[in-house]
Amino acid sequence: DGSYTYAADQTAADNIAAGESQSDVFVYTMTDGTENVSANITITVLGANDNPSAQNDVGVINEGGTLTVQNGDNANVSGSYDANGENSGDVIDTTSSSHKDTDLDTSDTLSITKIKKSGGSDSNVSSGSSYNSSGTAVTGTYGTLTIGADGSYKYVAQSDIAGLNDGATVTDTFTYTLSDGTATTTADITITVIGGAASNNSPSAVNDTDAVNEDATITKTGAQDDVLNDDSDSDG
């Protein structure tokens, strides 16, 4: 009877940028029982802006160390760690298949626009910045993260984290906002800090005083009289 339906292929249509269009053409044949004639059905599919996709990032660092994550837009960077806890990679890596933030609209430019620590408020990230040039610094629980709009970042862990024993771990989490200029999405950067023997926290000693008569002997016993009673160590 000539009626028809058309369902766009979402996977193929995702590659059409906003403001652009592509056409699907179908040829049909009509007959009156004696003669046949052909004509076209042309469907124009209009592109729309697709949201960017942000991937969660993780890092591992020793207590008191520095984690530097470079921008990898011009190099294939996967995010490997060396023995010192330093990383090569970045939040926005358009070349690596194992670690990347993406946008189906290939003409869009991705950038980081906001950053915040877990439970904190957003701080704006300057356009065109990198971690070492006009980057935005956010102080977390166990260190400070500095991030740029290009996705590069640097995390410096505190050198004396109270209660962090050798081999024990704590995590600092930050949430970044990824923008393609129109739409935004968010993901996390989670840094694991490992306590080390070299960064063992020093104990705290408190001066003790007492009095004794001339030619007498003073003896202290029991928990209340122990000179260690008012001394402490944050490592437990």
Residue ranges, per PLM feature:
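Acidic, turn/loop-rich segments in luminal/extracellular domains of secretory-pathway
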Residues: 1-49, 126-197
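Extracellular ectodomain surface segments
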Residues: 53-138, 199-236
